[in-house]
Amino acid sequence: MRVLSIVHEHDAGPGVFADVAHERAEEVVEWIPARQAPPAAEGFEAALVFGGAMHVDQDDGHGWLPAEKQLLRSLLGLGTPALGVCLGAQLLAEVAGGGARRMTRPEIGWTLVELTGEAATDPLLGPLPARFEGFQWHSYEASPPDGALSLARSDACLQAFSLTGAPWWGIQFHAEVTSETIAGWIAGYRSDEDAVRANVNWDAVLLETNQKIARWNTRGIGICRRFLDHAASLLVAEAQA
């Protein structure tokens, strides 16, 4: 299996998903849209789309965004399974016919996430506890197209969705993140406008991270494994059809 890993920024990479991808795939192709021309959509059996500080409506400020969206449209047309995280989830929602919108208040830190009833049979999120704490850092929220399944929510926004008729999932929470990444984000972005608006207690976030990251990484690894295993099962089914 050949997996496309779309990384928007050096400090927003695949995290704990990286080892899973290399474990499950024969080849992992990392694409950094701001630096490289897009690869051909054909030839990938799965795609992972990660986060970034930019937003889905900033095509003018990030000239590579339209090309990425076109590549994602091609992947959707081919039926290629995709899992988007944070910005990645918002991009998948927009490309599929929905969008993303700015939130009244950014969501940063550890928050309670609750699965919906529709998540019970979902191959990715179904094995998770009905309620869990997940790590967040976002000021936009995904608005998936009509017909998409809402799989999880927090008090602030939709946290996970899947498309009907296509093997695409979006998760707003950062299931891929490591403790080192969180510390780096706090050091680099704590003075940003959105972080200031959120009025975050950074010492508390770091303390919670130390307490919760091991379990969180286990859950993130599980989500990525189940996604790639599902993608592999679709390949087997296609070969047997």
What are these regions (language model features)?
Residues 4, 29-31, 48, 83, ...:
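Hydrophobic/aromatic beta-strand patches that form the interior of the parallel beta-sheet core
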Residues 96-180:
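Pocket-forming structural segment of enzyme catalytic cores
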Residues 20-23, 63-67, 100-101, 153, ...:
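Glycine-rich, phosphate-binding/catalytic loops in enzymes
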Residues 1-80, 197-241:
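N-terminal beta1-alpha1 cap of cysteine-dependent amidohydrolase-like domains
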Residues 166, 175-209:
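C-terminal helical/coil "lid" or tail adjacent to the Rossmann-like core of SAM-dependent
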Residues 50-119:
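Cysteine-nucleophile active-site neighborhood
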Residues 17-18, 42-44, 147, 181-185:
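Short aromatic-enriched loop/helix-cap "lid" or pocket-rim segments at secondary-structure transitions
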